Structure formats: structure tokens, C-alpha cells
Amino acid sequence: MTITIRNLVENDLEFLVEVRNECRHFLHNATEFSLEGCRDWFKRTNPRFYAIENNGIRIGYFRTSEWQQDSCWVGGDLHRNYRGKGLMKAAYFELFEKLKKLNVKTVFLSVLSFNEVAFNLYKRLGFQTLSITDVQQSGTNKLTNSIQMVKEL
């Protein structure tokens, strides 16, 4: 296993949409995204997203947002064929190293309470719960809890 992360580029968007839509029931926004809409969004916003690779094969991606002087929000999705193998944990360690080089000292994330696998991973990675709020998952009528977490790098 050799996990690397790199800047996500336009050629990665088809993969991103496939993985994101497959994982959408675990996300705060469960709306299905189109490739065309994703391309427009990517060109318009130039997001700081990262492709996750294992031995040169794309297996998932990280998204970052709300960058401040020394903090940002993070989240990630892994292709279903690569889950349950410890790859996301290793990928987060790579992401943390990259963020440290960018002078990020604090990372935040938000996870839906029913996503127990992700919540437990975040606890093992050293994230602490900041708050829990009631939310309606976009694209559904589902009411659930959103857990905001923080980690010092």
C-alpha cells in the first residue's frame, strides 16, 4: 500500500462525480450531481480538492473548504471497492502532512450521526466532538444529527 494525494484536476471529475454520488446518502447534501454541473462548478470555484491514490490508482478524494489563516474544513469519500481496508486512515495521515506544510494547524469536519464508520474513524484519528446540531439532509426529508469535530495537527 502506497497512499498519495495530489491536487484534483478536471480529468478527475468523472471519477469524483461517480464516487460522490455513490456516497451521497452519507453526505449533508444527498442531491445527485451531474458531470456537467460539476465541471461548471469546478471551473467557477477552483476548489482545493485532492485525489487519493493507492499505488497510482485513484481510490477517492478529499475536499477542503472554509480556509482561514491556519485552519480549514475537510471531508473525504472513498470508492466502495476500497472501503474497509484501512486506506482512508492512511490517506488522512497524508492529508494532514500536506496541510501542515500549508501552515494549517487546525482541521474541522462535520459528519452525520448515522455514519458510524466515518465517525469512529475520525475518533481514531484524534478528532474531538465540538457540537451536535439537528439538520435536514439536503435532497431528502431525513432529519438527523450533524456532529462537528476538530483536530489540532
Where are these regions (language model features)?
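Conserved acetyl-CoA-binding loop of GNAT-fold acetyltransferases
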Residues: 123-133
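Terminal substrate-recognition subdomain of acyl/acetyltransferases
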Residues: 141-153
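Hydrophobic adenine-recognition pocket in adenosine-nucleotide-binding enzymes
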Residues: 8, 78, 111
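Acetyl-CoA-dependent GNAT
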Residues: 24-83, 98, 152
